[in-house]
Amino acid sequence: MLDNGFSFPVRVYYEDTDAGGVVYHARYLHFFERARTEYLRTLNFTQQTLLEEQQLAFVVKTLAIDYCVAAKLDDLLMVETEVSEVKGATILFEQRLMRNTLMLSKATVKVACVDLGKMKPVAFPKEVKAAFHHLK
């Protein structure tokens, strides 16, 4: 666990790779998404609960990813996730995919809270904002 975030282990499976045993570029997004989802669980809420109880969803608003070094078949990796900014309807996540101390990829992901009935951004519920603000 990071001081201001969360670490999540990921194993690279055959299904994640191309014919050369290198992780296909889109799979990195899966790794980052899983880590954000598990991070939310550690803060005692899930996207499913927000959806069912409040008709709210977290959606990716912007995403920037930098591929530095290739991940390969059977690598055991760690996704490090930190919150760098919390605003009314958005949270900015900084994520790194690591093999030991080597950074393989990094991503900046801005996630927005959307009211699914209106399909418009809305402020995060108080309990969600409080969970992230205590980390700052």
From Swiss-Prot:
Q: List the disulfide bonds.
A: none
GO MF term (any one): fatty acyl-CoA hydrolase activity
Q: Looking at its record, which EC class is this enzyme?
A: hydrolase
Say what the protein does: Displays acyl-CoA thioesterase activity with short chain aliphatic acyl-CoA thioesters, such as propionyl-CoA and butyryl-CoA. Enzyme activity is relatively low, suggesting that the acyl-CoA thioesters used in the assays are not the physiological substrates. Has no detectable activity with 4-hydroxybenzoyl-CoA, lauroyl-CoA (C12:0), arachidoyl-CoA (C20:0) and arachidonoyl-CoA (C20:4).
Gene name in the database record: ybgC
**Record's NCBIfam families?**
thio_ybgC, YbgC/FadM family acyl-CoA thioesterase
Question: What is the protein name given in its UniProt record?
Answer: Acyl-CoA thioesterase YbgC
Q: Which domain of life is it from?
A: Bacteria
The record, for PANTHER family, names: 4-HYDROXYBENZOYL-COA THIOESTERASE FAMILY MEMBER (PTHR31793), ACYL-COA THIOESTER HYDROLASE YBGC (PTHR31793:SF37)
Task: Give the residues annotated as active site.
Answer: 18
A Pfam family annotated for this chain is: 4HBT_2
What does the record give as EC number? Answer: 3.1.2.-
What lineage is on file?
Bacteria, Pseudomonadati, Pseudomonadota, Gammaproteobacteria, Pasteurellales
Going by the UniProt record, its keywords in alphabetical order are: Hydrolase
Tell me its family.
Belongs to the 4-hydroxybenzoyl-CoA thioesterase family.
